[in-house]
Amino acid sequence: MNLKKHSERKFDLITVGRACIDLNAVEYNRPMEETMTFSKYVGGSPANIAIGTAKLGLKVGFIGKISDDQHGRFIEKYMRDLAINTDGMVKDTEGRKVGLAFTEIKSPDECSILMYRENVADLYLTPEEISEDYIKEARVLLISGTALAQSPSREAVLKAVSLARKNDVVVAFELDYRPYTWKNSEETAVYYSLVAEQADVIIGTRDEFDMMENQVGGKNEATKAYLFQHQAKIVVIKHGVEGSFAYTKAGETFQAQAYKTKVLKTFGAGDSYASAFLYGLFSDESIETALKYGSAAASIVVSKHSSSDAMPTADEIKALIAQAE
């Protein structure tokens, strides 16, 4: 897939959706009830992907709504310090807060997240706050599935996708399913399908694609056949420790292994995977190599305490791949 076109545009990538606060337990191997110390990081899948791709050297912008308070200012400064453009970032004027995610790390196999997502600012991004002039400066627009969970954010995202299609901007859709933001599975399937049918690149886990198709135990062959009837050029389906698969509209299939690592926690892997996979495509690497980049980046992030701070450099990704091979 050619991401080299429109190289004159200001941004390689603009991500759309939530930016929130992650409070990760400093004390491992204990329940949250006994945890006294947490470290603060920027979180939220589209924010993490913006951070991950910026660390890999891409020119990145962000569209989303944040709180007009200390947490919102922390998020904005952190992203600006990484040279992420925040002209598309909107401050909520009605007192809404950013989401908070407290993480519990009992063991590498037993991690959980306690979410505070009631009345959060990011889900109140409105269609009027989506700028065509901003979006048409991007080569790729990345949509987060969670941003579709509620109005008016849902309509804002659909407008962004429409403007991207109008201005020859590649649409990437990271399914990013979070059950706590949706009313029911039928609603999820409707809006996921609506965006997936307009996306050029779709990335998700096998379980997330099952949510899109409103079924259990779905098969990759059926998923790709459905998506290739529409706009999709590349479909990436992740199967955890079994590795990941990429399918192209031209009929090619690629596979990458999951790289072994000392796992500290399980969250953050998907965001680092998407960041590195897209970086691989922008770098004109083969899809097979881009898959390796994604798998290696995920392996690095799950071995570290944070998600956003732990997003790897290209050298770190390539070193892990070389070591494994």
Swiss-Prot record:
The answer on whether this UniProt entry bears the keyword Cell wall biogenesis/degradation reads no
Q: Which SUPFAM superfamilies match?
A: Ribokinase-like
What is the disulfide pattern of this chain?
none
As one GO molecular function, the record gives: ATP binding
Q: Which reaction does it catalyse?
A: 5-dehydro-2-deoxy-D-gluconate + ATP = 6-phospho-5-dehydro-2-deoxy-D-gluconate + ADP + H(+)
Name the InterPro entries for this protein. Carboh/pur_kinase_PfkB_CS, DKG_kinase_firmi, Myo_inos_IolC, Myo_inos_IolC-like_sf, PfkB_Carbo_kinase, PfkB_dom, Ribokinase-like
May I ask which residue range the UniProt record assigns to the signal sequence? none
Top EC class per UniProt? transferase
Which GO terms fall under biological process for this protein? inositol catabolic process
Please state the Enzyme Commission number of this protein: 2.7.1.92
Pathway of this protein? Polyol metabolism; myo-inositol degradation into acetyl-CoA; acetyl-CoA from myo-inositol: step 5/7
Q: Which UniProt keywords apply?
A: ATP-binding, Kinase, Nucleotide-binding, Transferase
Recorded family membership: Belongs to the carbohydrate kinase PfkB family.
* PANTHER family reported in the protein's UniProt record: 5-DEHYDRO-2-DEOXYGLUCONOKINASE, HEXOKINASE FAMILY MEMBER
NCBIfam families, per the entry: myo_inos_iolC_N
Function recorded in the entry: Catalyzes the phosphorylation of 5-dehydro-2-deoxy-D-gluconate (2-deoxy-5-keto-D-gluconate or DKG) to 6-phospho-5-dehydro-2-deoxy-D-gluconate (DKGP).
This protein's name? 5-dehydro-2-deoxygluconokinase
